[in-house]
């Protein structure tokens, strides 16, 4: 748990990926700093791509980025 809290860039990316995979808008970014927002948007873009390709439910289990 402490290790996850240390790396805020990965955490922002993962939260963005999960938001994109859930089909949420990019306006929902909770981060204000440029670095965290950039990482969140990168994850969101990749999550939206997977969302568009139908990687939902059981199909998204194969993608390890959405775990955590």
From Swiss-Prot:
HAMAP family: RMF
Keywords from the UniProt entry: Cytoplasm, Translation regulation
Annotated compartments: Cytoplasm
Name of the gene this protein is made from: rmf
NCBIfam families assigned: PRK14563.1, Rmf_CrpP_fam
GO biological process terms, semicolon-separated: regulation of translation
GO CC aspect terms: cytoplasm
Domain of life (superkingdom): Bacteria
Function: During stationary phase, converts 70S ribosomes to an inactive dimeric form (100S ribosomes).
Protein name: Ribosome modulation factor
Principal localisation: cytoplasm
The species this protein was found in: Alcanivorax borkumensis (strain ATCC 700651 / DSM 11573 / NCIMB 13689 / SK2)
Family per similarity comment: Belongs to the ribosome modulation factor family.
InterPro entries: Ribosome_modulation_factor, RMF_sf
